[in-house]
């Protein structure tokens, strides 16, 4: 059984998508030509630009190329730390005794002193804002006992997020041949961090932090240059070049860019800004349906009820070229014969969103409630109905 849900509007473009069988739609309009220029050329070795809500890759180059993450590693370090906070395993007020290893870490520092006690909250700020390698190791040791064991945790989280081309050896990003990631994996991580921990994500927008009488400023200069930018993290080593993961929100649209392997701190800012401006200028994101919203009904045989509502497990967003919303088409395909029992969230069909005959999203339609088996009499009655339905179909009636 196929039901077509479509909207190709010319006048009512401001309306939300609706089911075709609930309105009388005009004849299909000819697709409106749209021109989207190619992404800007960048000086980055690898980059990716995605929409946060839909996950659509808007532009990319060498997004699966294995690279050294440098201090972008600390995005995962922070993700693990915040998960530990959320799970109640540590608290912001925990006092951490600074080990000699943490104190003597090379590279960027928050200038903690060996043997002194520092709160988890201050260490997080020292890691996120000041990119302190000393703070990162201190947090790793507090959570896992050693940086090596903490790296195992990092890899477990990477695996759970689907970061299939990433492997961590430390909490800082200091060079190691077995410590690597990709632009796409970093975008997955950034998206997960923002989605799961929106309150803690606000730490990444802070421009400065003072500890032990020393004020240091966030190295992400886009926080000053572009008011829509509210994170995330810079990175640099000689071998990795200058890197930056950025997120920006304008109106209801949030983009995430990852720029890797540029030649200078100034260049990573310029290339990131190029990508963000391109995405916001030429694309738009729409929320089509909410999770759990009743979108259609499926016929249920041999059940206590004859129909069940269908919807989506998650909110459905699509990212499309600007001005193309009215050319979206939505179709649903529902399984032709569904017999009780039916579980809640059981897949019973599929929703397809297309733009100008190109599929841009496919999601499962799931039952919004369970349906129990009907009585013996109800089963017999439905079996008779199915028999007649089959005979009529065979006769072409």
Predicted feature residues:
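Cleavable N-terminal signal peptides
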Residues: 7-8, 18
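Domain-terminus/edge residues, biased toward the C-terminal soluble/receptor-binding domains
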Residues: 163-167, 175-180, 184-397
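A generic local structural motif
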Residues: 6, 33-35, 243
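Active-site-adjacent loops and short helices of periplasmic peptidoglycan-processing enzymes
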Residues: 20-187, 191-197, 209-212
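Positively charged n-region of N-terminal signal peptides that target proteins for export
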Residues: 1-4
